[in-house]
Curated annotation (Swiss-Prot):
PTM-bearing positions, type Cysteine amide: 62
The name this protein goes by in its record: Contryphan-Tx
Residues recorded with modification D-tryptophan: 58
Expression across tissues: Expressed by the venom duct.
Annotated positions of the 4-hydroxyproline modification: 57
Family: Belongs to the O2 superfamily. Contryphan family.
Role description: Its target is unknown, but this toxin may modulate voltage-activated calcium channels (Cav) or calcium-dependent potassium channels (KCa).
Keyword entries, A-Z: Amidation, Cleavage on pair of basic residues, D-amino acid, Hydroxylation, Ion channel impairing toxin, Neurotoxin, Secreted, Signal, Toxin
Compartments where located: Secreted
Domain comment quoted from the record: The cysteine framework is C-C.
Domain of life: Eukaryota
Entry GO MF terms: ion channel inhibitor activity; toxin activity
């Protein structure tokens, strides 16, 4: 039982070290490289934004 505990602790230590080392290489080169959410209001706002860009046929609903 003691050997199994040591084995598990060593495995956890190795995996956490690997994750920390690999995580450092993922940084984007620029803050603008991160994709931004154009429609934070969800699907309904996305639909209304698409209608406004094309010329909305339902004027009262298109703000």
């Amino acid at each position: 039982m003691g050997k199994l505990t040591i084995l598990v602790l060593v495995a956890v230590a190795l995996l956490s070290t690997q994750v920390m080392v690999q995580g450092d290489g993922d940084q984007p080169a620029d803050r603008d490289a991160v994709p931004r959410d154009d429609n934070p209001g969800g699907m309904s706002e996305k639909f209304l934004n698409a209608l406004q860009r094309r010329g909305c046929p339902w004027q009262p609903y298109c703000g």
